């Protein structure tokens, strides 16, 4: 889903430039040349995002090779290195051919980065994918904000779990994610949906991969806790986590122990 979101954003951008240039009868050759900045996490924090950027490079080429995609990554510990995150994003505006910057996921600091980009280069379009900052806030600087339909997903995920025969839904997250308005609202919807379908809703907490324990520590916690959770809640339980780094160890243990 994330790969598709990034790809659609850039395809939309490319088409818009083609039509814009086609409308100019006497357009200079240089007007057809533009670059697109793609900002993602690293493979350890959000592999899907990074692979999506690689797919775009494979299709449209990297700037260093004469293509249009300039891909950069923000730090794994982006919560503590917000200034670095901002600098990485804003640095893309130094390229005179840069016409759009897509940040996916739009982690904290993206709003400020877009503000600085607009100050120095108002011609650059700023796109935010899966915003970690409140949408009304990031919308003040972004030209387009794209998020999953978290309202519908809150209901549909529970309904699907019910249709699969689950009697318990275990939601795994941590305080940083739960502070996001989109995620807290989705949890409220999930709770209401569980009530509707007669399911038990459980909140479990796991370490934040951006904290001192890092990705490895967070994943180890999931590996160790899942067997106990399955024993506690039963094999008819559905498990859901809000962080990419938690997903792989969670799936691994569910395949081994059930659930």
Please describe what each predicted stretch is.
Residues 42-45, 106-110, 131-136, 175-179, ...:
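Solvent-exposed loop/turn segments at secondary-structure junctions
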Residues 60-81, 170, 191-215:
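Short beta-strand elements in bilobed, periplasmic/extracellular small-molecule ligand-binding domains
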Residues 1-34:
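Short, low-complexity disordered leader/linker segments with a strong preference
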Residues 117-151:
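Flexible loop/hinge segments that line or gate small-molecule binding clefts
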Residues 100-126, 190, 210-259:
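Hydrophobic alpha-helical
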Residues 32-34, 65, 96-100, 120-125, ...:
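Loop/turn elements at helix/coil->beta-strand transitions in domains of secreted/extracellular proteins
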Residues 53, 150-204:
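An alpha-beta-alpha
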Residues 32-86, 102-108:
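Extracytoplasmic "Venus flytrap"
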């Amino acid at each position: 889903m994330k790969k598709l979101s990034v790809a659609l954003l850039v395809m939309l951008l490319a088409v818009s430039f083609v039509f814009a240039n086609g409308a100019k009868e006497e357009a200079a050759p240089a007007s057809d040349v533009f670059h697109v900045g793609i900002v993602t996490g690293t493979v350890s924090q959000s592999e899907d995002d990074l692979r999506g950027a690689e797919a775009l490079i494979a299709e449209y080429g990297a700037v260093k090779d004469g293509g249009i995609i300039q891909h950069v990554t923000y730090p794994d510990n982006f919560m503590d290195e917000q200034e670095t995150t901002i600098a990485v994003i804003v640095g893309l505006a130094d390229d005179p051919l840069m016409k759009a910057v897509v940040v996916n996921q739009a982690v904290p600091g993206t709003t400020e980065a877009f503000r600085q980009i607009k100050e120095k280069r108002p011609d650059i379009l700023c796109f935010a994918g899966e915003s970690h900052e409140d949408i009304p806030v990031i919308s003040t600087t972004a030209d387009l904000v794209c998020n999953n339909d978290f309202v519908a997903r809150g209901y549909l995920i529970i309904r699907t779990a019910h249709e699969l025969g689950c009697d318990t839904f275990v939601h795994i997250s941590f305080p940083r994610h739960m502070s996001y308005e989109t995620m807290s609202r989705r949890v409220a919807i999930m709770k209401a949906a569980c009530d509707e379908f007669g399911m038990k809703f459980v909140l479990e907490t796991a370490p934040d991969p951006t904290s001192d324990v890092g990705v490895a520590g967070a994943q180890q916690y999931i590996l160790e806790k899942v067997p106990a959770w399955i024993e506690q809640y039963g094999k008819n339980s559905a498990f859901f986590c809000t962080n990419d780094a938690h997903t792989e160890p969670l799936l691994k243990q569910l395949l081994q122990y059930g659930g």
